[in-house]
């Protein structure tokens, strides 16, 4: 539960969608997968789509592929930010390719930042950590969200929490991560080892694997990370 929902969500829904789509496509003989290919441009005659140019990354060979229709599903451009929950492949190249072909881009200024990305990787620590009662702390040990959203505290909407964290950092109340980056602390210790393992086992595993921190023993280093881009091809 967080500040903008009154019912808890299930985790891993995106992975279920991807698996179902992939499994369904595998059932059709007329769908060909070109894995590890990189599209470089859209080919058109000024009026209609004609095909694409692409590189097979394993061989470095360049190809032109004819086509009658194109669906661009390259995702957002989250990797333009230093800290992002996006996959390394989520660069703006798909958007750039469409723009160079004359397509309009829309609402590109609307970017959502998730308040709790783990340092140094930027991997997401979900709202579940705060939904179960986790605290956000500045270097003075204060639950600083009381100064920005006293009614919701850590369960305030993402944009409010993200801005609050950056305000604390910019005003000198942040921690210094070993990488030199400024951050805040997400403290789960008061929840107890048993609850953390039962309710937040996935978060604990991520924290141990990617930061070397067991949240049952010490707070997690976090900062806002690019999480979602509302804009795209119009």
Q: How should each PLM-predicted stretch be described?
A:
Residues 74-84:
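Flavin (primarily FAD) binding-site architecture
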Residues 33-35, 40-49, 53-55, 202-234:
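A glycine-rich dinucleotide-binding beta-alpha-beta segment and adjacent secondary-structure elements
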Residues 70, 90-97, 234:
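Extended, hydrophobic alpha-helical segments in both membrane/secreted and soluble proteins
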Residues 1-17:
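Single conserved hydrophobic/aromatic residue that forms the stacking wall/gate
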Residues 97, 103-227:
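An anion/pyrophosphate-binding glycine-rich loop and adjacent beta-alpha core
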